[in-house]
């Protein structure tokens, strides 16, 4: 008996040690990740069937973004409604697994908003990866089917909960409850995004007030009074704080003090700035159709600490950025992502009849100069056009998201504001050179009888009618 007891004790001790090792290592693995150096944004771009897919963008500073895959979609959903919106990027605590979890919704794919609200997909679309570049086939995760009369599942988010050792997955579902049919935030727990616990109400506003978009950020000790801050779009952009993901949340106020309410913006998206205690809360300017706007803060729990960025201090890239999420990247992750989806080549644009001069921007004006300094002011990426097929746009290297754009037939370097007018004015057809067919000319998309040309060294959009103007409108795209 004593020998049996000894063996049982040994087994019990080993099991305890194994459990202790596992339970201690799992939450702490997040702290063992290498330092983060860059940022990856997953998003959708608009309302067409192609726009409602997964797009990626990269940034080194969190404010100036470059579209990956030359602005093309990266993942397409072939399941459910065959479209996705509101993607959430999720990393495992150990950094060895990633998920994209998105709304299964495609307006313009045969479903209108009324059906999407009242009889939409009850599932989310999920992809899984071990390296951020090779993704599994997607699957549907039914999250609202277990909610009595749950009518859809929108805007998913997920965050690791160290208190329970799994993820809190939360989303919005339209449910008639207590006399009010409206969207509320539900949550469930999951370890693998294939199965979930029974959904519970997470956030519900009083009366008929809906809430659809909410995202949580974890804040380090010493910054504000709360470990977690939640930004939600209801009638306002409301901030709430808690020291436990599944505990009580305290209303901290909203962003109306800087002129932002739920009538103008939605889709709050947090980003922690690498290596310092600063945060960016991106908000989707849905009412004006301008895409994401960054709002800056050094204390997420204090509404008075938020400020709008200076003009020209951010650039969102060539595609419109709609509701998504941002993942801070380690150097290894960043290298993999950029190797898989490299940015377009960096080029200079040389004048045909002044071959010592190159197109450059200077104080947002555009001209041809010799000996361009700093060199990056004369470096460009010729990328797929912002509008039309078989077209190009010319994007600045040191001001990502800024393009050569004509206005009043004069050229300036301007940030893409997401409008159709900007897209047309910043798009060209790259044709054989008008003065030499081995060179290149840029025909305006919005004014096809006019070409990009220099006049007195300044770039203009003019008709071309003689040998001089043909030479002025001829360039070489070179390294």
Model-derived segments and spans:
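Short coil/turn motifs at helix boundaries and re-entrant loops, enriched in small/polar
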Residues: 59-62, 129-132, 190, 297-300, ...
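Carbohydrate-active catalytic/glycan-binding domains of CAZyme proteins
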Residues: 31-346, 427, 437
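Short, exposed beta-strand-loop hairpins at the edges of beta-sheets
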Residues: 317-318, 461-467
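Extracellular glycan-recognition/adhesion modules and their associated mucin-like linkers
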Residues: 225, 231, 334-365, 382-410, ...
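C-terminal region of N-terminal signal peptides and the immediate post-cleavage residues
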Residues: 17-33
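N-terminal export and membrane-targeting signals
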Residues: 1-12, 25, 29
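Short polar catalytic/cofactor-binding loops
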Residues: 43-50, 61, 353-357, 364, ...
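Acidic glycine-/aspartate-rich tracts in secreted/extracellular proteins
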Residues: 246, 299-302, 364-365, 409-410, ...
